[in-house]
Each structure stands twice: as structure tokens, then as C-alpha cells.
Amino acid sequence: MSIRIGYKASAEQFGPRDLVEYAVRAEELGLDSVTVSDHFLPWRHEGGHAPFALAWMAAVGERTNRVLIGTSVLTPTFRYNPAVIAQAFATMGLLYPGRIMLGVGTGEALNEIAVSGREWPEFKERFARLREAVDLIRDLWTKEGVSSDGPFYPTVDASIYDRPETPVKVYVAAGGPLVAKYAGRAGDGFIATSGKGMELYTEKLLPAVKEGAEKAGKTFEDVDRMLEVKVSYDRDPEAALENTRFWAPLSLTPEQKHSVDSATEMERLADELPIEQVAKRWIVASDPEQAVKQFRPYLEAGFNHFVVHGPGHDQERFLTQFTEDVVPLLRKLG
């Protein structure tokens, strides 16, 4: 099995110009993909960022020649109309053929309530919206005069006039087996995040992806299994640990984050966590073999595409050290 290794551009932590340069550097260093988070509000108020992901993708496309570029992830169901997302990604698919992917998820309150003022719906509605949105996006990429009477996104004779011959690939992010099964059935790829206990991946998520793929007449290998790996690698052990602190919000439970609708409140809750709890979500390593040892269980579970998210503020340092020390060892596993 061939391993792909990518870079996660953290739009919650850096401004757009810096993020473009990091993506360019990732390609120069031999990585295979760059993905970007799509936030309207960041995880933190102080020092936080939230540039527009789609503008960033186009800028990266102009500055690179090879890497796959995509969202990890975008919610096409609340502050966006999925028809507009279909148009945007069709355009990028023409500009950068074969290099664009659309990673989607059911969303979180932090990014959607601020622009709607509505109550955050329960999972059942969010998942229904996602399925309808993906169906509509794909219809608009492959058909003309699309009329839909769906409950959330009705269209009347809608057409996208500029679209690539080969539609953009859709990756579905999932944290539970229901959406993972949908990712296997309807997605070209599946996205998960690391650090949540191996049983989740081996007993729930990946088996569900396989089941969904088989129900759609595909094989497990037909679905790109992408894992966003939270890895704080630095040759200095103290720096490797301390670099995780900015990302303390990731260690909050889903229940703690469910209805949080401001970066200030998210930051307050996160800063109450001890560094030891914050670091639990991360592979914290200063030795290459130690880092690879913690990647190996994910590879053995069935993931084939690792997108690394380094938490520190010095991303040039992270990219250089990680690609020099760890990437060659990871490539040997594939």
C-alpha cells in the first residue's frame, strides 16, 4: 500500500499569506497534499485567524504544480449554499485539473451560529443537510438544468457553465460510524482525526467505511483513507510538548464544545486545561523512530494518507525537521 503524506494548513492559527508560503514549502519538501481548515471564527480570540479557505486554495494552486489541494473540512450546509460551493470547486477543478478535493463535514456551532443567529441543530438534521448538499453538488457537476425540491436546498433549473470533465473528488469527515459508513458509500475519500483511541478507528470508523464502500459496489481501497495526524515533532523535547498549548481547544470534549459560539469562550474553556491533558491529543516526539512508532498503528488499521498538523508557531521549523527526520521513515512503511 502506497502512503501519501500531506500538510495541514491551520487557518485558525496563521494569516493567509503565511499559510500560502507554508503550502508552497510543503510541496518543495516533497509532500503530496495540502489541506486547509475552513473557519469563520478561530479556536482562540487572542492570536487567532480565520482567512477564507477558498481564496487561499486558489492562491496555492497558482504557486504550486503538483500537490493535491483541499479543505479539511468545509461545511456546505449553513453559511454556504451548496450550489455556490459546487460552482467554486468546479472553477478550481478547471484551473488546477486533478489537484482539487472538497472535504466536507456536518459542521460545528462555532462557525455557523455567528452568521445565522439560529440555534445549533441536532446531529440528525446536520447529517440530513450534508447528504442533500453532497447530492446537489454532484448533480450540478454532472447535469444541466438541475431542479431539486429538497427540504433544505431547493433549486430551479440550475446549471454550472464551467466545470471540469472529471468532477472534483469529495471527501467526507466522520467521527462516528454512521457518517463513516456514508463516507465509504458516497465519498471518494474519508477523513478522520488522530488521537481519539485506536478502538474508534479499528472497531468503528474503518469497518464502517468498508461496509459503506461495499454497499456501493466499491472496494475499501477505492476510498482514500485520510487521517489528519496531530503531531508535535521537534528535536527539542521541551518545545515539542509546549507547542501543543495553542491547540488546547482540541482537548475539550464534544459536550463542552457543542453550543460554544464565540472564540473568546472557546479560549477561556481551553486555557483551564493542564498541558498534560492538552498534549494527549497529540503525538509528541523528538525522536524520529518514536514518532514513526506512533504512526504505525494507524497504518496497520487501514489509513493510507497522513496529513500532518504541527501545532507550533514556527511552521518552517516543523516542516523542515519533520520532512528530514520522519517522512523518509514513513515512506519506507508503504
From Swiss-Prot:
It comes from the Bacteria. Signal peptide: none annotated. Its EC number is 1.1.98.2. Coenzyme F420-(gamma-Glu)n binds at D38, T75, T106, G107, N111, G175, G176, L178, V179. GO terms for molecular function: coenzyme F420 binding; glucose-6-phosphate dehydrogenase (coenzyme F420) activity; oxidoreductase activity, acting on paired donors, with incorporation or reduction of molecular oxygen. It catalyses: oxidized coenzyme F420-(gamma-L-Glu)(n) + D-glucose 6-phosphate + H(+) = 6-phospho-D-glucono-1,5-lactone + reduced coenzyme F420-(gamma-L-Glu)(n). Substrate binds at T193, K196, K257, R281. Keywords: Carbohydrate metabolism, Oxidoreductase. GO terms for biological process: carbohydrate metabolic process. The active site is at H39, E108. InterPro entries: F420-dep_G6P_DH (IPR019944), F420-G6PD/mer (IPR050564), F420_G6P_DH-rel (IPR019945), Luciferase-like_dom (IPR011251), Luciferase-like_sf (IPR036661). It is an enzyme of class 1 (oxidoreductase). Gene3D superfamilies: Luciferase-like domain (3.20.20.30). Homodimer. PANTHER family: 5,10-METHYLENETETRAHYDROMETHANOPTERIN REDUCTASE, PTHR43244. Catalyzes the coenzyme F420-dependent oxidation of glucose 6-phosphate (G6P) to 6-phosphogluconolactone. Belongs to the F420-dependent glucose-6-phosphate dehydrogenase family. This is F420-dependent glucose-6-phosphate dehydrogenase.
